[in-house]
Amino acid sequence: MNVRRSLLGLTFCTCYLASHLTNKYVLSVLKFTYPTLFQGWQTFIGGLLLHMSWKLGWVELHSSPRSDVLIWLPASALFVGIIYAGSKALSRLAVPVFFILHNVAEVLTCGYQKCVWKEKTSLSKICSALFLLAAAGCLPFQDSQFDPDGYFWALIHIFCVGSYKILRKSRKPTVLSDIDQQYLNYIFSMVLLAFASHPTGDLFGALDFPFLYFYRFHGSCCASGVLGFFLMLSTVRLRSILAPGQCAAWILCAKVVTAGLSMLLFDMALTKATVGCFLLGGLGEALLVFSERRSSS
């Protein structure tokens, strides 16, 4: 059982690493900054592969009542905001910077649980939230590659991620499984982004993309869709088999490896102050793992 869990964790880390680095390559190196098309393609591939997996009997999809589907639509709308704003932010920000800002969503979730749901929060989790918030708050002032648009889209991404987590927790228990929820997210995102591609200008703007007929662009886009699907699948499996503390530990491991390799593969200006922000954010996330492990033990 321990070997199986370790293999699952390593599979998740590999998918996490490959998916984020591939997306960063398409967005920042090839500069395919048309999120309605890029994310629409990824959700199309994800939905198609998930449907094929269901037909082959590899995953279970349940026939849900229309009322449950309608109740889930606000979460699907937030999912669109997550992937759209995340794509815009990642195209302009370094991967470690994006991760530090993304972690603020945990602060929003923690604050909502304590202030609105009146849940008991451990001291380690409060300290974790403060460290994550401090790291993200100091980073814009120390980032030598500061990009206002990148940070703006990161804020929208943070809000959508935090709201999605809160909404998802408030709907438990639900007849929709994690796979059912993701399938609905894929369908809703694919349809909405397809309709949005024309008014946003992405549909015709992409015709002027310089690498439109290059194999490396086609290969990278195909890889991003497939890797995104396997990342989703491995994440669902990880959360269904492992305790929350163990899941958080694997996610932290995946983020550290991905952030470290991204600094070697993509251009990034490092200063002592930015490294300090990264370390503070890492400490905050390590404390979050510790608090999750204590609460689940």
Curated annotation (Swiss-Prot):
Tissue and organ expression note: Widely expressed with high expression in lung.
Transmembrane segments: 7-29, 32-52, 69-89, 93-113, 121-141, 146-166, 187-207, 211-231, 250-270, 271-291
Covalent S-S links between cysteines: none
Main location: Golgi
GO molecular function: UDP-N-acetylglucosamine transmembrane transporter activity
Gene Ontology BP term (one): UDP-N-acetylglucosamine transmembrane transport
Name this protein carries in UniProt: UDP-N-acetylglucosamine transporter TMEM241
Gene source species: Mus musculus (Mouse)
Upper taxonomic lineage: Eukaryota, Metazoa, Chordata, Craniata, Vertebrata
